[in-house]
Amino acid sequence: MGRPTSHGREVTGTGRSVLGRGSFVGGSGGGNRNSYGRGGGGGRSPFSLLIVVVFVIISIATGKKSNILSSILGGLSSSTNSTNSTSSGTAPMISIPTLPSSIGNTAASSISGVGSAWSGVADNRGQLDTSVHESAREKFYRPTGGDSVTVMVYMCGTDLETKHGMATKDLIEMTKANISSNVNLLVYTGGTNTWQNSVVSSSNNEIYRIADGKMNKLADDNSNPSMTDPNTLVRFIDYCKNNFSANRYQLILWDHGGGSVTGYGYDEKNPNSGSMNLAKIKAAVAQTGIKYDFIGFDACLMATTETALALSDYADYLIASEETEPGTGWYYTNWLSNLSSNTAISTLDLGKKIVDDFIDESNRSARGQSTTLSLVDLAELKATVPSSLSSFARDTASYIENNEYSKVSYARTASREFAKSSNIDQVDLVNLVYNLEQNENDPTIQSILGAVKYNRTSSNMSNSYGLSIYFPYKKLSKVDRMVQTYGDIGMDSEYTKMIQQFATLQASGQIVGGGETTPANTVTGNYQGSTSGSFSAADIDSLIASLISGSLSSESLANIGLDTSSIGFLQNRNMSDETIRNYVLSNRLDASKLQWTDRYSTPKIHLSEEEWNMVSSIEENMLLDEGSGYIDMGLDNFFEFDENGDMLADTQRAWIAIDQQPVAYYHLSTTKNGDETVTIGRVPVILNGDRANLIIIFDGEHPNGYLAGANTDYKATQTETIAKNITDIVEGDRIQFIYAYYGYDGTYLDDYKLDEEYVVGKTAPKVSYVLVKDDNQITYKFTDIYNNSYWTPALKSK
């Protein structure tokens, strides 16, 4: 695997003080705050930040909301008029003023060369594949000439609309399309507290038809059913089928997305209704009896192998994103106009237009952000992928069973991961297979590349080939849920068994490793660091036997993120207890060896190369001593090795700053391809009165980092799906930097904010490293191949 990857830094001077300039926020805010370095990932209770991507703050024309006059109980009905309707029965066109320009686009956009090196398998971006595998079924849609098309957009506006008007923006794009009479563009609206336009009702769910630049309300439903209830989706599709029959159907689901684990949707008006998982989505589209030209997700993270297989019997193509989507989302005007001018246009050409416009518009208005969108042939995927995936799963299970878990773990951690800080455990399937097999001609790789007919990404997204897959590593508590989903959607049983094998060995390594979420020992007066990971063989036997038998205490299970309801996967394995015990005993990081030598000159950590091979990541943590407790400065993946291969302590005591103000910074991800490295992290703030995270990116053209934008910081209990709502930082934005605050006993107490507001000026805020002058101590977090976290002894500033 090689050693973990750091990034460079250049210290620009001494920073401003943090101590004595702030006050407590009062309340826990967003996320999980039970550990030092709460945003770093890889610990036992990782902060479940809901990753999001770039949006532009929109000023929406306001006006009186439309009143709904004709609603019926329990169903959809025709609507005869509206107080906002014109004499022709159509609602007025919604519009917005010119979008504000953003600061810092030059720095954020000039990354054309970053991430261009793809590992092993050739870059498949921007190449339209018109071939069809001989075993693929016939397409459901066959052009006849003069085709009629019904496009169904299921638009759950949620907080994306309430806060940012994102759904309104896309409705405007639809009204600007030249829609012909043989295209029925139908939109179901709901799921949001406040629509940011004067047409769509915030009281009732509604159906609109968009034509001639206007929105005509067709039906409403004042019962406001949850849009994550599959029955609501079924009713919308049935309405469209019964009233706008066509020989070509297209379905787009608009909202948050959470990938294979969570599925689609978050209804802001029905927040306790959860999401619509893949099994429910599959059941809904199956129930309507329609065969679709394509099913698209204008939502995050839904381009998964599981999504594709679940829908392969009901649609010819899938259009979706592996990564989180920018708030700009799909750009609707052009492809709808193209479809109207030729309703028999090939889905390959139409899908290519959707993908190209999405990437190009994102590059224009969300520069510097990671974007992906792919067009997948479900007919071909159904014929080719299941057998090759089954073979890959058997081979991988064989590695795990034959003392090569570390090989699989290395491949998993090295693979392109999506929404990494959210711990949804989705990685690019092609990249995963290549990292494990080192063969670009592997049947699974070739079957996926064959099914992905068109794929594009932003230039900073390498190793994203069009379809991701769930592979557990960060959150073992989700394995049982995915096993259930796999059964419901008919996923390959060999893959299901393999991930349970992997999770079982990982859980065993975690319970034996006994890593620590926090460096509590080092900050409460015991400066010896972690002592876990040094159990005797007898201890290991006992721990593994208790874990696998289900007799381990609830407290011990909680230490590895599990409880008695989420350990079913432990019973589905081919490995004996003895095999597991022997492997873990021979492949573990003994944390007692994480001790500083040469402590009073340049402290260093010495491990053998075999021990370094057990380390998957290293992050530096800094705590400021406030006098009554500690201010947490976060986790940064900066570290250096000397000529002997020993890791050196940071004797400079430098930290990331924005315009010379040291800030709490949490490393999210590092992607390395050849000589190119891209590191992404977040800075928690209050942005214009709302919780948010500034996004910092280090890359080849910006080795000292730049501010790429900001994203909303959701509370972990709000939704498991992922929002598409990052924004550029613009002149006049008001920022207060916030830091987690802990007592001397290691207990999280509150968030500490700088009272002085930082107001963004005409030039982009500058990211740099500065010397920290406040009293501080540092420690390093080591994460091993089982995702255990260990901490070095603390080093106090002199």
Tell where the protein language model's regions lie, with residue ranges.
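Hydrophobic alpha-helical membrane-insertion segments, chiefly the h-region
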Residues: F55-K65
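Catalytic-core segments of thiol-dependent peptidases
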Residues: G190-G289, A299-C300, T305, E322-E323
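Residue-level signal for short, function-critical loop segments
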Residues: G157-T158, G191, D255-G257, Y473-K475
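Terminal, contiguous helix-loop blocks that mediate binding/assembly
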Residues: G74-K139, T144, N242, G259-S260, ...
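Structural recognition of the beta-strand scaffold that forms the well-ordered cores
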Residues: T150-M155, N184-T189, Y249-L253, D293-F297, ...
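N-terminal extension/subdomain marker
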Residues: G2-P4, S35-Y36, G41-L50, K64-S245
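N-terminal targeting leaders characterized by basic, low-complexity, disordered sequences
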Residues: M1-G40
